[in-house]
């Protein structure tokens, strides 16, 4: 249990619930997380938890909304301070790496939702996140082509998919190794290879 006070304002209680779910997802299969486990982690009864979230699906919606809002806000801030499209791509990459390193339950939650056969609202939120994230990447990749940083014949969609795919690969490698810190160690080298692959060689 986290030892949080039992009497929190509704917004703080919802935020604490999201935090508890993300923490639990780092320790176990997200699909196996029960409302009992969430309530126990927070030091609450199930009844108290359900006063804020009527269903487990509502909890997952809140978690996915937080992931989307938090990740996109962070990458937007990172890109805004960059001096060029390629610098912005690198800033986004490292910010994303920092985010999943700090919250290892997040990629587990995302992978878990995308594997759901039903088109649930949490799954739709993940799909919207992937779409919005990809759109940001394609805009930067297009700007890089226009400014001559990137290859003129670069396939924007493929480059965006590969960008996300390398992060997913780093996450999978860290899960296999049981070593979250490995993501941060390997990321600079992986991005360097990616950057060389899309750069203008002229």
Predicted regions and their residues:
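Generic hydrophobic, amphipathic alpha-helix propensity
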Residues: 13-22, 38, 63-67, 71, ...
């Amino acid at each position: 249990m986290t030892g949080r006070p039992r009497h929190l304002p509704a917004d703080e209680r919802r935020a604490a619930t999201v935090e508890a779910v993300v923490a639990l997802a780092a320790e176990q299969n997200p699909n196996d997380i029960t409302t009992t486990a969430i309530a126990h982690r927070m030091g609450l009864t199930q009844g108290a938890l359900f006063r804020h979230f009527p269903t487990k699906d509502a909890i997952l919606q809140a978690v996915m909304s937080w992931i989307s809002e938090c990740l996109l806000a962070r990458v937007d801030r990172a890109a805004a301070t960059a001096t060029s499209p390629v610098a912005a791509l690198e800033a986004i990459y490292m910010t994303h790496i920092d985010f999943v390193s700090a919250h290892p339950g997040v990629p587990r939650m995302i992978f878990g939702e995308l594997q759901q056969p039903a088109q649930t609202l949490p799954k739709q939120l993940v799909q919207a996140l992937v779409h919005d994230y990809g759109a940001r990447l394609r805009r930067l990749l297009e700007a890089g082509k226009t400014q001559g940083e990137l290859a003129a014949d670069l396939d924007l969609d493929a480059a965006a998919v590969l960008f996300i795919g390398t992060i997913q690969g780093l996450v999978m490698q860290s899960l296999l190794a049981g070593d979250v810190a490995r993501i941060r160690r390997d990321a600079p080298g992986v991005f360097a290879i990616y950057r060389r692959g899309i750069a203008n060689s002229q």
